[in-house]
């Protein structure tokens, strides 16, 4: 296998080609699935109201996310909108927008609503749920989130990245995943998620990235479940799936993407994306 430029990122595992040992067993993640990417978006963010329409380098944030999802080339991309003003912004950028019930309690409920409106015939068997506040997300990470679904034992897939500092490990805002990767493994089962430091003891810690790939039946089952005790305690929706016996597989990627949750985050995104626009 010839050695490409080390700055090029592999479409399948989201690691640089310079680490050749990771790539010799790859097959395209999407060969056996027909994904659709859905981006839930609403105006009512608590910490940064209306952030999905915040201007970044001349475009609403949701449009940056839309363009990066399209760049992945995995399949159709649509925004599941809670309000018409978001739909208008998406359509003005040439995107597909679906108006959903503004009262949905979660992004998972919103994308399931949009899925049934867009694809009532069930053509798409995998649904990628991409957050609308990740304006610099690498399209390669959307390929990476499909990797666990190569194993039929997993119902849901998501991503983790290494925790790289003590500050990150202690941060309540950083969700940690209890998982362990064997030598050479890129996928592992998720055993628990917490805002606290898990697991205890020496060893790697993993920062959960809230991008999910659901098998269609798993998404339907998940949204039909009532909120679970640990979900309510930790305020982490994915624990509902684990408590119900569903299996979540995690793929590891090099670093957590930058998310916009505060005004300071927004200003940083404007500086970074403005520089490259």
Segments predicted by a language model, with ranges:
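Cysteine-centered motifs
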Residues: 10-13
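Short, positively charged and aromatic/hydrophobic N-terminal segments
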Residues: 15-19, 25, 29
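N-terminal glycine-rich phosphate-binding loop and ensuing alpha1 helix
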Residues: 32-81
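Short, high-confidence coil segments that cap the C-terminus of an alpha-helix
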Residues: 74, 122-124, 152-155, 246
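Short phosphate-binding loop-to-helix
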Residues: 78, 85-144
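Conserved core of the sugar-phosphate nucleotidyltransferase
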Residues: 137-228
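Conserved alpha/beta core of the MobA/IspD/sugar-nucleotide pyrophosphorylase nucleotidyltransferase superfamily
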Residues: 203-277
């Amino acid at each position: 296998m010839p050695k490409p430029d080390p700055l090029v990122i592999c479409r399948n595992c989201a690691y640089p080609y310079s680490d050749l040992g990771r790539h010799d067993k790859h097959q395209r993640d999407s060969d056996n699935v027909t994904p659709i990417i859905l981006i839930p978006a609403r105006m009512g963010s608590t910490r940064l109201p209306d952030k999905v329409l915040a201007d970044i380098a001349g475009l609403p944030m949701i449009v940056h996310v839309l363009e990066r999802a399209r760049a992945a080339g995995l399949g159709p991309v649509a925004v599941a909108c809670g309000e018409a003003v978001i739909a208008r912004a998406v359509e003005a950028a040439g995107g597909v927008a679906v108006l959903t019930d503004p009262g949905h309690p979660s992004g998972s409920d919103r994308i399931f609503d949009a899925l049934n409106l867009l694809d009532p015939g069930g053509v798409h068997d995998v649904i990628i749920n991409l957050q609308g506040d990740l304006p610099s997300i690498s399209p390669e990470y959307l390929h990476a989130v499909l990797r666990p679904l190569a194993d039929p034992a997993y119902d849901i897939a998501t991503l983790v990245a290494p925790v790289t500092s003590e500050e990150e490990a202690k941060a309540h805002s950083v969700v940690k995943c209890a998982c362990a990767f064997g030598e050479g493994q890129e996928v592992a089962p998720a055993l628990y998620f917490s805002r606290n430091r898990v697991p205890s003891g020496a060893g790697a810690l993993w920062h959960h990235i809230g991008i999910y790939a659901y098998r269609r039946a798993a998404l339907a089952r998940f949204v039909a479940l009532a909120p679970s005790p640990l979900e309510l305690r930790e305020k982490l929706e994915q624990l509902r799936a684990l408590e119900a016996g569903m299996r979540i597989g995690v793929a590891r990627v090099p670093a957590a993407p930058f998310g916009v949750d505060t005004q300071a985050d927004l200003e940083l995104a404007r500086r970074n994306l403005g520089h490259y626009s």
